[in-house]
Amino acid sequence: MESQKKKDRYLRIYHQLKDFLVKSDDIDARMATIVAVLHHKMETFFWTGFYCLKDGELIVKTYQGPVACQVLKKNTGVCWAGINQGKTIIVPDVHQFPGHIACDSRSKSEIVVPLKDTANRIIRVLDVDSTTLNAFDQTDAQYLEMIVGLINL
């Protein structure tokens, strides 16, 4: 997708979500709404969901797409890299990422956006996979970070 078109789409999604999410302060409802809107509005999003930290494990929560890995092995894969590095991770080709966890063999690229709680601890990540190589860039990172920030409105 052309860069400006992608930015415009993300801005529309952001404002749409902001209007939706003020109606409930329930975190699960907010995550579900974010996932549903992103998954259906961004054509390259093949799997879209949240993994949450619980007792030192990453457990799948709300998602859309094919069946997910329920628990991600500690310190392995892109989601754990996002947590351990404390930043958004963009992987152009998941098959070149050491320790990549292949929940679905059709995934080719991935972006993971960590989300912190009010005490500044990472407690969950937004994970998005695509069946297209190099599907994600800094525009995706910038706007997905803004969008997941809406969870803590």
Task: Please describe what each predicted stretch is.
Residues 1-63, 67, 146, 150:
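Intrinsically disordered, low-complexity terminal regulatory regions
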Residues 2, 18, 124, 130-153:
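Juxtadomain coupling helices with adjacent low-complexity linkers
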Residues 45, 53, 57-105:
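Regulatory sensory and allosteric helical modules in signal-transduction proteins
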Residues 47, 112, 125:
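Short hydrophobic/aromatic beta-strand element in the GNAT-like acyltransferase core
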Residues 55, 118, 131-133:
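Short coil/turn motifs at secondary-structure junctions
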Residues 109-117:
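A short, aliphatic-rich beta-strand micro-motif
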Residues 116-123, 128:
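A glycine-centered beta-loop-beta connector
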